[in-house]
Amino acid sequence: MNAAFPSPSERRLQPAAACFEMERRIYPAEQDSWIMRTTEPSLPEQTGPPHNPGLKRLIEAKREWHHRPDAEAGEQGFLGWHERGYLPHFDAPNVTQFVTFLLRDAFPVTRRREWEPLLREGNESLRKRKLEAWLDRGHGECWLRRPDVAAQVEHVLRAEDGRTYRLRAWTLMPNHVHLVVDVWQTPLSSLLHLWKGRSSREANKGLKRRGTFWEREYFDTLIEDEVRLRRAVRYAENNPVKAGFVCDPKQWLWGSARFRDEYERLPSERTAGTFTRAAG
């Protein structure tokens, strides 16, 4: 067994191939964690991703073929595959996730005609690149450009690193955040609630403002092997380079790359091994 990742039987996950095949039949051309649809004729005014009318069928298929939380995980608050009206989410103990969450105005309603067509792109890889390019243009207030605000958010993200979860990588961009995180015994949705709640309170104080700081929805992708882990870490840490802010990831002041040693390890990984899980 690969020591870096728990086996599928340990996570109680069924092989995903059948689920993905079902997904292709139910939801053609929109098959990844960025799944969003915008074909409804009367969409409400909003800044975030539009409502996804086919989402419930997709989640039902994923639950049938891929994962259902056991009683113990359910008691801890893990939901397995679930949705909150816009995007599919996966939540289980002892897994690694790639997560992206945004400032509230990263997709401003005033420019909806520009960003909405990006969500209809049928090619998964191309859609991700287009969405990332949109975010990297820095729409909205971009409060994370301010060093004091970025420092507060990063402090909150790292506060429980190694105790409640383990961060494998992170990058704060002007209007969004990328994380690669080992989820242990606290549901990802609870971690996001914690991170967003604490950081928004501190950020709003510094900005002398009130109101919503973060977009409610987020994007998450389950990472199931070492190859995908390395790819996710590289993607997150290279985002400032791709956006043209720096020439080397280690030059970016609000990311994990600057903490890596000559073996590319973060401080929390130097004593923890390649993959660690909470006891139990």
Where is each model-derived feature located?
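Short catalytic/metal-binding and nucleic-acid-binding patches
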Residues: 1-280
